[in-house]
């Protein structure tokens, strides 16, 4: 890494150590530390997310999600698990933000550590967007139907809401722009 990035990563490391100590958490395993420099040097977002929530990095490590290629439905299954006890819009918004942050760190880490190629990274980002939008839509639609009744078309049939993913999402080409 260039010296400027090394200095930045050193500052991140110091802040991370303070956050870990303040929360009485354990430091990540040595194998993960070898990947930390290029990942944090390449992504301020990942570094700051880990500093803000040191348990995030530990959770990704313990779960094996940093080392594992996502299979079909893996992202959706993790989100479904996260949303089991969510019963209102405020908690849904919080859970979706936390899930997005966790998954974005996982995807970026795998990309920057050289554990995932371009196709995997683009696919994972697209899956994340797709399942998050779908989960939000399903819950919000159900809650609105409970409150106001299901919307009906001219023929009286219940109508669903639809979100169209076009462009990069529809083409499964979302990136970190």
Residue ranges, per PLM feature:
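Non-catalytic regulatory/linker segments of enzymes
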Residues: 1-177
């Amino acid at each position: 890494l260039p010296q400027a990035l090394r200095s930045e990563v050193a500052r991140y490391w110091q802040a991370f150590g303070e956050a870990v100590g303040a929360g009485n958490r354990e430091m990540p395993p040595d194998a993960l530390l070898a990947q930390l420099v290029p990942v944090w040097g390449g992504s301020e977002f990942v570094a700051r997310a880990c500093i803000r929530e040191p348990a995030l990095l530990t959770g990704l490590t313990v779960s094996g999600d940093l080392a594992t290629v996502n299979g079909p439905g893996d992202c959706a299954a993790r989100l479904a698990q996260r949303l089991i006890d969510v019963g209102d819009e405020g908690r849904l918004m919080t859970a979706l933000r936390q899930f997005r942050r966790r998954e974005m760190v996982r995807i970026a880490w795998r990309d920057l550590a050289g554990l995932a190629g371009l196709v995997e990274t683009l696919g994972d980002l697209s899956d994340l967007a797709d399942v998050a939008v779908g989960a939000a839509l399903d819950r919000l639609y159900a809650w609105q139907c409970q409150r106001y009744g299901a919307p009906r078309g001219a023929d009286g049939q219940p109508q669903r809401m639809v979100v169209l993913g076009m462009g990069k999402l529809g083409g499964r080409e979302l990136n970190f722009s």
